[in-house]
Regions:
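Conserved S-adenosyl-L-methionine
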Residues: 302-420, 427-428, 435, 448-449
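Active-site metal-binding core of divalent-cation-utilizing nuclease and nuclease-like domains
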Residues: 25-67
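A short beta-sheet element
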Residues: 664-726
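Long recognition/docking surfaces used for binding and targeting
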Residues: 195-296
Length: 779
């Protein structure tokens, strides 16, 4: 007869032999709990549906009270997990999930389900449910117990847990920013104040004393502690760095009003220090720097644009950084690239403390020109465990700085150069970085898209210089809103360059479309990985890059010249295999909505088809055509909305996709000079969110001059036009604010269309296909 006590004993014995249990680091309870909070949460957790219920085991970590483990056991492996996981009384997984659903209201819960009576034939499942969520996910290897330390580490480094904690940190950054604003701390000093508190909190004497000191005494103690901690560093600029913190002693509120400075330090310890301890080598200060400057009146004057942490980590993987890498960032900022590089190198060092010391003292080199940011960088590196003695204050173009860096023989360059610098173009910073690297080393940099698109002028000369001396290995087009949190409207590309090896003739550079990193914007908390997509996306990107895979709609290899556009959008093919009737139906519905709003009649029964014949979309038999071979392209004539006379007769079509481009309705009589003839396709040529889209205008209209143009063809009617709009919209990913749909880019854009027996566009098929879809009778 099955005996559940046998199953329980396997786990009990395992825990009683665990180091955490022996060292008294946990509270181990069976089928009950003395913890008031846990007991209250389980008061209605009976598997029978009423009253209290307890799992077989509950484990609490004394130093991590927000995390608990619950364990549920069944003797027979056939009762391990039900299909729908809703038979709580009979199945191990189901029961564990029930308890977790109650406990996760206040705790992060690791639930372990165990079944079986034979030690070598146990079934073991692990799931993690985070506090305040109703979702859980599988974690750890199935059918194996792990040491409690591994369970704790796995929980602390779980991607979803990190995202949750990071969101809490960002929320706190907003609260802290508001508090510092109230306390009249200037935006440019806020990050320094936080970094100073974090440095001082490393000192045991300061930690023990700061809560009991008067404001003036505390300000003095804070500055002195920072000085004592940083003076160990062999850096000739250390006195300048310490001087940066002197504002704390003279600040009217911080140094005089009771508890203000103390409360800031206390909250920094609780919210930021704990995060840094858990997630080592993450540029936490950089995130606060971004937040503090987000609402500043003059953020560009105050500082720089910081690369998001998931991208700094991506750079390290692109560059294959390991324990022997020597990394230089000549535009260091707050040190995000160096911190990510240090993390990768230390992981690769595998616990070798001597090697770790060498990494921090000799293999991390940074250069920063701005004084306040240099101070912040040094502090940031201290917080993350040294690595600060090789930070150089100055310009990366100074000969003295160049010679100093070369002594270290760097073999990896990582940088995000200043955008729009008055003295030097972005590619100049990259060429400068390349001169510092050993031959065959890699430089990975992120630059405005305009730098890689240049066909004329100084930037073209820089592109020529780059190919004459180095190899352009890869270029990746990055998400349009990557720097949204920094309030910077710039479309960027990442370039990968092999140093000091001339670009070989006929060598194919790899181009990748890396526009979707899985991050989304929220008004209250900015751009983040809310849906935990980034890990898989990054894995796919890196695999494709390392294997140089050419994937339709994602990547392509191309032999390039300096005057070419160095971006995937110029060369990648559109993936027509994803085209379905839904794409066409949406265009039809959008056009009908536009007709209603622009005062046009919509007849027939809503949703009806004009014919019931079924047509297939066999895109393999279609042929490519240039846009200029299909359309006669003309400019639109509209002016700004301020000069137009409003009315109800004629639509003003702007650079937008929604509502068929409709911006406003105008009077026809008083705007004659701006009117374009209807029955045409309108190409939206500019605009961060709409460049590359098209609309169909059945009647005369006013188009936004300079941002739209129109295409005419005698075969065009409203049915085949909507077919064409659907096809043309597939080209949208190739265009953006940084790469407009103008000139030859528009004329030479290739689209794939059905053809007739003479290999010409099959206008009749396009018309008939639209007529076979719902709502076609309402057109």
């Amino acid at each position: 007869m099955a005996n559940e006590r046998i199953t329980e004993n396997f786990f009990r014995k395992f825990i009683l032999q665990d180091e955490f249990y022996i060292q008294d680091k946990i509270i181990f309870e069976e089928q009950s709990s003395k913890d008031i909070k846990i007991d209250k949460l389980l008061k209605n957790a009976s598997k029978s549906g009423g009253g209290k219920g307890y799992p077989e085991f509950i484990i609490q970590f004394k130093e991590n009270p927000d995390f608990i483990i619950v364990v549920e056991c069944k003797a027979d492996t056939k009762f391990h997990e039900s299909k729908n996981r809703d038979k709580y009384k009979d199945y191990a997984v189901d029961g564990a999930l029930l308890y977790s659903s109650f406990l996760s209201k206040e705790f992060d819960v690791l639930l372990i389900a165990i079944s079986g009576e034979q030690k070598n034939n146990l079934r073991i499942s692990h799931f993690l449910q985070l506090k305040g969520t109703d979702q859980y996910h599988s974690i750890f290897t199935e059918d194996k117990f792990l040491p409690l330390e591994d369970y704790l580490n796995g929980y602390q480094t779980d991607e979803r847990k990190f995202n949750q904690d990071f969101q809490e940190l960002l929320k706190y950054s907003k609260t802290l920013n508001d508090n510092l604003h109230t306390l009249k701390v200037p935006e440019s000093n806020r990050s320094l104040l936080i970094s100073g508190a974090l440095i001082a909190l490393h000192d045991k004497a300061f930690r023990n004393a700061y809560k009991y000191q008067k404001p003036k005494e505390l300000a003095e103690n804070l500055i002195n502690t920072i000085k004592n901690k940083l003076t160990d560093v062999q850096n000739k600029h250390i006195e300048d760095i310490i001087t940066s913190y002197s504002f704390i002693k003279t600040h009217t509120i911080l140094s005089k009003q009771e508890n203000k400075l103390r409360d800031i330090i206390e909250s920094v310890d609780e919210k930021i220090n704990n995060f840094i301890k858990t997630y080592k080598y993450f540029d936490t200060l950089g995130q606060f720097y971004i937040e503090f400057l987000r609402y500043a009146n003059n953020d560009k004057g105050l500082g720089i644009v910081l690369t998001p942490p998931h991208i700094t980590e991506l750079f390290c993987e692109i560059a294959n950084i390991n324990k022997d890498s020597v990394v230089v960032d000549t535009c260091t900022g707050t040190g995000g690239f160096l911190i990510s590089a240090m993390k990768q190198m230390i992981i690769d060092a595998g616990g070798d403390k001597k090697k770790e010391l060498n990494i921090k003292s000799k293999q991390i080199i940074g250069v920063e020109l701005q004084h306040s940011i240099f101070s912040l960088t040094c502090s940031n590196m201290y917080i993350h465990g040294d690595g600060r003695s090789n930070l150089i204050k100055g310009s990366c173009f100074d000969e003295e700085v160049i010679e100093e860096i070369k002594k270290y023989k760097p073999n990896v360059g990582l940088l995000n150069p200043p955008y729009g610098d008055k003295k030097h173009k972005e590619l100049e910073f990259i060429l400068n970085n390349l001169t510092l690297l050993e031959k065959g080393s890699y430089c990975v940099a992120i630059v405005p898209m305009s730098s890689v698109l240049a066909k004329t002028g100084e930037e073209l000369l820089l592109k020529k210089k780059l190919l004459s001396n180095h190899t352009l290995e890869a270029v990746f087009s990055m998400p349009t809103e990557l720097f949204h949190n920094s309030k910077v409207n710039v479309v960027t590309a990442v370039i990968v360059i092999k140093a000091k090896e001339k670009h070989p003739q006929n060598y194919k550079t790899y181009f990748g479309y890396w526009k979707d990193d899985g991050f989304y914007k929220k008004k209250t908390s900015g751009r983040a990985d809310y849906y935990n997509k980034w890990s898989q996306i990054k894995k796919l990107w890196l695999e494709n890059y390392r294997n140089k895979d050419e994937v339709i709609g994602h990547s392509v290899k191309k032999n390039i010249q300096p005057s070419d556009e160095w971006c995937v959008e110029a060369y990648m093919k559109t993936d027509y295999s994803k085209l379905t009737s839904d794409n066409f139906s949406k265009v039809i519905r959008d056009f009908i909505a536009f007709k209603v709003i622009s005062n046009k009649n919509v007849q027939s029964e809503m949703g009806a088809k004009l014919n019931n014949k079924k047509y297939s979309l066999d895109t393999n038999k279609w042929k490519y055509f240039n846009i200029e071979d299909i359309f006669s392209i003309k400019s639109t004539k509209g002016t700004t909305t301020n000069e137009l006379v409003e009315g109800y007769e004629i639509p003003y079509i702007a650079a937008k996709k929604t509502l068929n481009g409709l911006e406003m309705m105008c009077s026809k009589e008083e705007n004659e000079q701006f009117i374009s003839e209807g029955n045409c396709i309108v190409f939206i040529q500019l605009g961060a969110g709409s460049a590359g889209y098209t609309t169909y205008q059945e009647d005369d209209f006013i188009g936004m001059s300079g941002k739209t143009s129109c295409g005419y063809n005698d075969n065009l009617n409203k049915y085949n036009a909507l077919f064409l709009v659907t096809i043309l919209d597939q080209e949208r990913p190739k265009f953006s604010f940084g790469r407009s749909w103008t000139g030859d880019r528009l004329k030479l854009t290739k689209i794939k269309l059905p053809v007739d027996k003479n290999k010409n566009p099959d206008w009749q098929f396009m018309e008939d296909y639209i007529k076979s879809l719902p709502y076609s009778s309402n057109l």
